[in-house]
Amino acid sequence: MDIEMIEVILLAIALAMDAFAVSIGLGAKSQKQSSAYVLRLAVYAALYFGIAQGVMPLIGYLLGAVLLGWLATAAPWIGGGILIVLGAKMLYEAFNGEIEAVLEDGFDENIRKKINHRMMFTLAIATSIDAMAAGFTLNLLALNAWLACLIIAIVTAGFGFFGIYLGKSSGTWLEDKAEILGGLVLIAIGVKVMLFS
C-alpha cells in the first residue's frame, strides 16, 4: 500500500468522525428501541452519511480543480490550511459539546416510533460540509479522486452503521473522543500537505 492510499484512508477516517459521533448520539437516544428499529436506523445512518460523505468531497475536488489553475503555487498552503482549520474546528466542537447540541436541535421525539428521514438527511449534510472543503485537497494527493471519494463513502458508512450500535450499548461518552481523533488526524494531514506538496 503506497503512502497516498494511506493518506486517503486516514482522511476518510478523520472525515467519518463527525458522522460517527452523530451516529453514537443517535444510538444512545435509541437505547430502549427494538433490535429491528436499531438495525434500520444503523442502515439508514450508513446510507445517508456514506453517500453524503462520498459526494461532498467530490464536489470539493471538482471546485478545487478549477481553482488550482489560478492558485497553483499557493495550493499546498491553501489545501493544508483548510485541513488544519477543519481539524481545529473539530477539536473546538468536541470540547464545546456542539455535536450534542446538533442532536438535540434536530432530534424529533417521533424518532422513537419511526425514523425521520428529513432529520437524517439534515444530519448527513451537516456532517459532510467539512468533507466538501477537504475534497479541495484531493487535488494535491497523487490519487484517483473518484476512488478516494468511494473510500471515504465506504469508511463513513461503516462508522455510521457501527456508531449506532456503539451508542446504543455505551451511551454518548465516545462522541467527543471521536471528534478529537478526527481533528488531530486532519491537522496532521494538513501539516503534511503544507510541508511536502
From Swiss-Prot:
Pfam families, per the entry: Mntp
Record localization: Cell inner membrane
InterPro entries named among the record's database cross-references: Mntp/YtaF, Put_MntP
Main location group: membrane
Topological relation to the membrane, as annotated: Multi-pass membrane protein
GO molecular function, one term: manganese ion transmembrane transporter activity
Keyword DNA damage: no
Gene Ontology CC: plasma membrane
Transmembrane segment boundaries: 8-28, 43-63, 66-86, 123-143, 146-166, 177-197
Keywords: Cell inner membrane, Cell membrane, Ion transport, Manganese, Membrane, Transmembrane, Transmembrane helix, Transport
Domain of life from the UniProt record: Bacteria
Similarity comment: family membership: Belongs to the MntP (TC 9.B.29) family.
Summary of the function given for this chain in its UniProt record: Probably functions as a manganese efflux pump.
Protein name: Putative manganese efflux pump MntP
Organism name: Psychrobacter arcticus (strain DSM 17307 / VKM B-2377 / 273-4)
Record lineage: Bacteria, Pseudomonadati, Pseudomonadota, Gammaproteobacteria, Moraxellales
